[in-house]
Swiss-Prot record:
The IMP cyclohydrolase activity resides in the N-terminal region. InterPro entries: AICAR_Tfase_dup_dom_sf, Cytidine_deaminase-like, MGS-like_dom, MGS-like_dom_sf, PurH-like. The keyword Hydrolase applies. It comes from Gloeothece citriformis (strain PCC 7424). CDD domains: IMPCH. This is Bifunctional purine biosynthesis protein PurH. Keywords: Hydrolase, Multifunctional enzyme, Purine biosynthesis, Transferase. Its EC number is 2.1.2.3, 3.5.4.10. SMART domains: AICARFT_IMPCHas (SM00798), MGS (SM00851). The gene is purH. It catalyses: (6R)-10-formyltetrahydrofolate + 5-amino-1-(5-phospho-beta-D-ribosyl)imidazole-4-carboxamide = 5-formamido-1-(5-phospho-D-ribosyl)imidazole-4-carboxamide + (6S)-5,6,7,8-tetrahydrofolate; IMP + H2O = 5-formamido-1-(5-phospho-D-ribosyl)imidazole-4-carboxamide. Signal peptide: none annotated.
Amino acid sequence: MGRLVLLSVSDKTGLIELARQLVEEFEFEIISSGGTAKSLQDAGIPVIKVGDYTGSPEILGGRVKTLHPRIHGGILARRDVPQDLKDLDANNIRPLDLVVVNLYPFEQTIAKDNVTVAQAIEQIDIGGPAMLRATAKNFAHLTVLCNPKYYQPYLEELRQHNGETSLAFRQKMAGETFALTNAYDQAIASYFASLTPEATENPLPTRFSVAGLELQSLRYGENPHQSASWYQSGTQPTGWTAATKLQGKELSYNNLVDLEAARRIIVEFDRSEPSCAILKHTNPCGVAVGTTLAEAYNKAFNADSMSAFGGIVALNQPIDPETAKALTKTFLECVVAPGCDEEAQKILSAKSNVRVLILPDLRSGPKQTVKVIAGGLLVQASDDALDNPETWQVVTEKQPTPEMMAELLFGWKVAKHVKSNAIVVSKNRTTLGVGAGQMNRVGSVKIALETAGEAAKGGYLASDGFFPFDDSVRTAAAAGITGIIQPGGSLKDKDSIKAANELGLVMVLTGMRHFLH
C-alpha cells in the first residue's frame, strides 16, 4: 500500500497537477469525496471515495461526509505512541500522511447581493475545519495544506527529503492552517453579529479580533528601520489582495497606504464622470473631474504639479491610450484604475518602474477602521456616510445656483479625505489648494489659499470641521472666494454666517463633520 492523502477542496486551483504528481511520482493513494473526487476521476486519476473507505455513505445532503473515526483516527494518531497504533490496527484505520483541504467560500457568498441567511449557512464548512485543525494539531506526524499556493513548496519538500517533509515545514503549515481557520470563524462570527437587532444601532461586535495571513514580506515599513509585512484579512482575496499588478517595482508599505487613501477618494465620484485623484503621503494634492479621463488627469496634475511629482494616481475609469500618454510624461509611483486597454498598457510599459494596478471593484473597502493603542484596539465604522445635499442648509442671504452647489459638493467630497484640520479650495471641479493637518483651522485656510494663488478668485472653500471664529471666512473672502461649505456646529456659527453675509458669500452647512486623523 502507498501512502495515503485526503483531498477535499472547494478551490480546485492546481488540484489535478498536485494529485497527478502525488500518484505518479510519490505513489500516494488518494481518498476524496464529492466534487473533488469527480474532478479527479474525470482527469483519469484513481480515487478511493470517502464513503467506500469509511463504509458510511454521505448523508444529510452531503453535510456529513468526512466526520468519521476512520478519517479522524488516521489524522490524529500519534505514530510514536504504541497504543495509538494498536487502536488503528484494531479498527482497520490507515494513517494519513497528507491532508489537503480548503474551505467553503463563506465570505464570497455573503459578499453577494441579497444573500439569505439560509444560503449563507450552507456555506459554513464543518468537516473542512475539523480536518484542518486535527491535521495541524498533529503536525509532528503529517502535513496539512490549506491553500493551493503551498502545493509546489510541498512537492519540493518531498523531493529534497527523500519523499518526506521536514518538521519545520509541517509546523509552518500548521501555523498557516490555524490562522486560516481563525479567520474563517471570525468571518462567520462577524456575519452573525451583523444580523442582531443591535447591529443597526451599533454595527461593532462585542468581541473584535484581527486575523491575517501573510501575503508578502515588505522591504520595510514607513521608514527603513521598521520591519513590515502585508497580510490578507479573511480567507479569500478581496480589495488590494485581489488587485492585478500589470507592471512596476514591488509595492512598498507606503505605496499600499497611499493607494488605499487614493481608493477612498476616487470612489466618492460617480464612474459616469471621468475623475482623477493624485496623492502624496495620503493627502490629495490634485483632484479633478473632466469630460475625458485624460482631461481629468491633466487638471488634477496641473492643480499642484510640484507635489504631484512622484505621486499616487487613482482613476475611476479604465485607462485609455490618451490618458496613458499623459501618465508617462512625469515620474509617478503608482497608478490604480478599474481597467486598462491593451494599447494603453503598451504605452505605460515605456515607464516600466511605475506600478500599475487594476482594481475592478474600487468600491470594495473595509467597513471598519482599526488603530492600535497601548493595551488595546480602537475600532470605528468607516466614514462611508453618503452626504445628502437635500439636507444641507443655505444659511446666507445669497443663495447658491445649481452650478455653485455642484462646485461646493466637489470640494466637500475632497475635504473628507484630507487630514484635519482640512481645507480645500477648488473651482471648475478641480482642486486649487489643499491645507492639511494644521493645528489651527485658519492656518490650513492660509496654506490652501496661498497654494491656489490668484486662481482662488471666484473659487470655493470646503472645511471638514466648523469655524470656531469668523477669521477663516474673512481670510477666504479677501482672497476672492465666493462660496463656503462646512459642517457647522460651532457656538459661534452666527459670527461666521454674519461675516459671510457682510462679504457677499454663499455659505452652506452640511450638518456632518468629516475629521480625519
